[in-house]
Regions:
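RNase H-like, Mg2+-dependent phosphodiesterase core
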Residues: 1-316
């Protein structure tokens, strides 16, 4: 398991401790694919509600770092590297999608279903994404997933924890490029996409105040103006905008929700870390489809992960 400093543990407690006298609603958002040259942008999102920290509530069922025996929820950049990385992502992603939806997605297409499902027409404009009815799981035995689910459900019941939402918003390359052109730059388009996802999380019914944490988007520090433009109905009020955290209080239909953009958000929020896992899992499955499409037509071509230098090699 990755070691954490005393400061990290203290910050995690301050950031994720229960709200006084209320059940704790925690939402989180993270992305995979904003920097690479090839493949989709995937935005993972999750929300949980209960009286305490989900990492503590699920400590016997879910690990906080890579584990041989349990599914893990942590930064995907920690969980994915090394042999079996996609299997580790799959084990955790399918567990929480099952907890949120009541059923496990059976195909890649079902994995992408939800409030931000890409339309079939959008996917069909990308021929490498037409074959998304491949069965899931790909890497983890069904029996192991069922055992994980039974263990996690028991832990949730004992702790009074509910997985309110879990999903992925996938933006294929053509949609991404068109959006960047409309917005004028990648950063503004990205903020617009994230704003729509956080609006969904912020307006989920909840029993009290809530907290939504987004892993900070690049080097951006000030979100007040774009949030006011994109979500005027929430009247976002800045609470702090410093190098480590930008925090806003939301009003209107999201009244009582506190929104934070944080450096290293996956260390501070279970929901944000889960968003990271969901986004990375979906992106890797879709990049695998992209590779399969082109390798079938160009024998000898080496697969790509989509990052800039290797993506250019793939395109040559």
């Amino acid at each position: 398991m990755r070691r954490t400093s005393t400061a990290d543990r203290r910050q995690a407690r301050l950031s994720s401790g229960p709200l006084p006298g209320l059940e704790r609603f925690e939402g989180g958002i993270d992305e995979a694919g904003f920097g690479p040259l090839l493949g989709p942008l995937c935005i993972g999102f999750a929300a949980l509600e209960g009286p305490g920290d989900p990492w503590i509530a699920l400590s016997g069922a879910v690990a906080r770092g890579p584990s041989r025996s349990l599914p893990a929820v942590c930064d995907s950049k920690v969980l994915y590297p090394g042999e079996g990385g996609l299997g580790r992502l799959e084990r955790s992603a399918l567990l929480f999608l099952s907890l949120a939806r009541g059923t496990r997605p059976r195909t890649i297409r079902e994995l992408l279903e939800g409030p931000f499902s890409p339309t079939r027409e959008t996917l069909d404009r990308h021929p490498w994404y037409r074959d998304l009815d491949l069965p899931l799981p790909r890497f983890v035995p069904h029996e192991l997933l069922e055992a994980d689910l039974a263990r996690a459900r028991g832990a949730c019941d004992r702790a009074g924890l509910r997985v309110r939402e879990a999903g992925v918003r996938a933006i294929p390359e053509g949609e991404f490029n068109a959006g960047v052109t409309r917005s004028g730059n990648k950063a503004d388009f990205h903020v617009g996409l994230v704003a729509e996802v956080l609006a969904h999380l912020a307006t989920l019914p909840r029993r009290g105040e809530g907290r939504i944490l987004v892993d900070r988007l690049g080097g951006r520090r000030f979100y007040g103006d774009p949030l006011s433009s994109l979500l005027p109905e929430f009247l976002p009020t800045p609470l702090r905008e410093d190098p480590a955290r930008s925090e806003y209080l939301l009003h209107g239909a999201a009244a009582g929700a506190r929104l934070s953009f944080c450096v290293g958000g996956e260390r501070l929020s279970f929901a944000c870390a889960l968003g990271s896992v969901l986004a990375k899992y979906a992106r890797e499955l879709l990049v695998e489809r992209l590779n399969a499409f082109f390798l079938d037509r160009l024998p000898g071509l080496r697969p790509t992960a989509g990052y800039v230098a290797d993506g250019r090699r793939f395109l040559e």
